[in-house]
């Protein structure tokens, strides 16, 4: 051939997924994880071919379709010659767990401590905190403070193939961490998103986005499954069990929606634009789009909710935050909340835009 064009197939954008499957439901995109196939997983049947459409199961997808497939690909590519420091992890069966740890980490940090410290579920801790602070009294509960967290964590670790340092056969080093990140980048499973700050000591740093949303969602499903095996939790009313389970999944869906919007906006942005998060001493804008030629910017809040709520735009109305933003990134031309409800413009000037329609318009 006189020429060849590389077509990247790992990542399927939301608009393409919606066009091919005829569904505009962003939650379906999150649950399918960017694949074009739906199915269900039986936790008890590790041999059944499946994806992660059913929230009562994820082990098969976690073990076969994500992390173990990554491990298998690394070990078979050119007879494993490119494994380098990961050879010992692969041979001991600990590479899958290492990858799962980084994916589960709230901030997706590629740090040695993430792999060495005793495992704690960030999804569990986040959900427990949110349920304790729930603004609606009828949904406020401290039930996750009263379950057997240790046994739930151990059950989750089994599902994710995660081992604590005492059970690890391989002495992990910074080289292992670096190469795991390097391979995930090569497989187009992660991307770096800039986080701009107003700190005098650090103007920006990188946040890691996982491009396949199912890599996180299936772990949240696994946590729900592990929680449902707890005796104290199972003695609760069906209504309360559903409330807690849905809160765990909703929390993760919200964080993944932010990642999806950020990554797809970054992918469609022009060379004259900068896209990232903007963090302040207190609070942040979920997304900033800066036009270098016009010296102007747009600021966004990204919410998974379908309903309008006044506090969704509180940072977009904060005069101090707006002044700091304008001082660094120029005139603010748009203040917008992306959510799953109908589009409208509020009397305070804040635009509300449907996130699914926003993603469909990106090119």
Language-model segment annotations:
Residues 1-141:
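Interdomain motor-coupling "hinge/lid" segment immediately C-terminal to the ATP-binding subdomain
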Residues 5, 165-172, 249, 253:
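Conserved aromatic-histidine-acidic binding/catalytic patches
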Residues 8, 190-193:
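A structural signal for short, well-ordered beta-strand segments and their strand-loop junctions
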Residues 10, 174-177, 254, 258:
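A structural signal for well-ordered alpha-helical scaffolds and beta->alpha junctions
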Residues 125-172:
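Short acidic, hydrophobic short linear motifs in intrinsically disordered regions
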Residues 170-187, 191:
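Short amphipathic alpha-helical interaction segments
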Residues 185, 193-196, 200-363:
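A cross-kingdom feature that marks ATP-driven nucleic-acid transaction machinery
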